[in-house]
A protein has these predicted regions:
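Residue-level signature of the C-terminal ends
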Residues: 59-62, 82, 120-123, 152, ...
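Low-complexity, Ser/Thr/Pro/Gly-enriched N-terminal "stalk/linker" regions
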Residues: 1-39, 156-157, 280-312
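Long, well-ordered core segments of solenoidal/helical folds
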Residues: 1-5, 71-88, 138-158, 210-227
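Long, hydrophobic/aromatic-enriched structural stretches that serve as scaffold segments
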Residues: 24-62
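Terminal, non-catalytic domain-edge segments
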Residues: 119-147, 170-181, 185-312
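Well-ordered alpha-helical segments within folded domains of soluble proteins
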Residues: 45-58, 105-121, 185-199
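Active-site-adjacent structural elements in enzyme catalytic domains
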Residues: 52, 57, 67-79
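Solvent-exposed loop and edge beta-strand segments that line ligand/cofactor-binding
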Residues: 34-48, 97-110, 134, 176-190
């Protein structure tokens, strides 16, 4: 995959997700490099850029090839440049068209960026090879990012809940993304945010409150006794995805109404539906409408964090 002039990476090539194991032909390499001249598709979506930074740092450790560490450090510089002054990150930079300018927690985009910078500061996960001159800049970016996270945690009345997947970059209000991704409280992205906050050393009162409030919300909205599974079906896809009773199983919706916590679902028409069965097949089987990601957070990670920082 080619690094563009912004020292960052796209996550697609020829309109398909990048296959990192694919050996590119000479023609592919030429097309790839030409397409990256302007860097308009530079992104942190789908692990792009952060994944490459980590890969290059690890490659430098193994090979000693200075091109790898130079490219990795250029990627870190890109992350620092792309951050808004309010602490958020857009999904794409410098392309701010449509929803690309929004502060993006979706698919852990902003959390992935923060995690790379925190690894640089702490010298862990192979990022100890990044030049120490970047640490002070990363520290500033981390503090800004934490501030943004705290400011964007949603409230119901006076009670903190969790986070929307994306926010308006200027107003910090919840925002829509694609037509089937309406503003909501996210049962998915909020997990990554909480895990990042729990990673911070010596958390202050605000961070502790943010974490405990989000966990309270996760427990409040969990759906017990059901699972979300693929089944064989007589349709063009040969399958469907449905909610079925399953004792002992716990799931969470991807989208909850900001005011009343009711799960909702959207097809490409952008119209809210109360059940996943009401949206078209293509979206029904093509998106993670229910998840189990909060389960480990609640059962393992959070109790360990409480023992370390709350009950010490």
């Amino acid at each position: 995959q080619a690094q563009n002039h912004d020292d960052v990476y796209d996550d697609h090539f020829k309109k398909e997700k990048v296959d990192y194991k694919k050996i590119l032909s000479p023609a592919d390499l030429i097309e790839l490099k030409q397409g990256y001249e302007e860097g308009i598709d530079a992104t942190i979506d789908n692990n792009a850029t952060t994944k490459e930074i980590r890969y290059l740092a690890k490659a430098y450790k193994k090979s000693g090839d200075k091109r790898c560490i130079t490219a990795a450090e250029n990627g870190v510089v890109y992350l620092l440049k792309a951050q808004y002054k309010n602490g958020g990150w857009p999904q794409f930079y410098p392309d701010f068209s449509n929803y690309r300018s929004e502060i993006t927690y979706n698919d852990n985009a902003m959390i992935n960026a923060l995690s790379v910078l925190l690894d640089v500061i702490e010298g862990v996960n192979d990022l100890d090879v990044i030049n120490e001159i970047y640490i002070s800049y990363c520290n500033v970016a981390i503090q800004r990012g934490i501030s943004c996270i705290l400011k964007t945690q949603l409230k119901q009345g006076k009670q903190l809940t969790a986070w929307c997947a994306q926010y308006d970059a200027k107003t910090l209000k919840p925002a829509d993304a694609r037509t089937f991704e309406l503003k909501s409280i996210s049962g998915g992205e909020s997990v990554g945010i909480v895990r990042f906050l729990m990673r911070l050393q010596n958390p202050g009162i605000e961070i502790k409150k943010a974490v405990t409030s989000a966990v309270t919300w996760f427990n409040k909205v969990k759906i017990t006794g059901y699972a979300y599974e693929d089944i064989k079906a007589d349709n063009v896809a040969g399958k469907d995805r449905v909610v079925i009773p399953k004792p002992g199983s716990t799931i969470w919706a991807r989208f909850y109404d900001i005011k009343n916590n009711e799960p909702f679902f959207c097809g490409r028409d952008g119209v809210k539906k109360k059940t996943v069965a009401e949206i078209e097949l293509e979206r029904r089987i093509g998106y993670a409408w229910y998840i189990q990601a909060p389960e480990k957070l609640l059962n393992e990670d959070y109790p360990a964090w409480v023992a370390k920082w709350i009950n010490k």
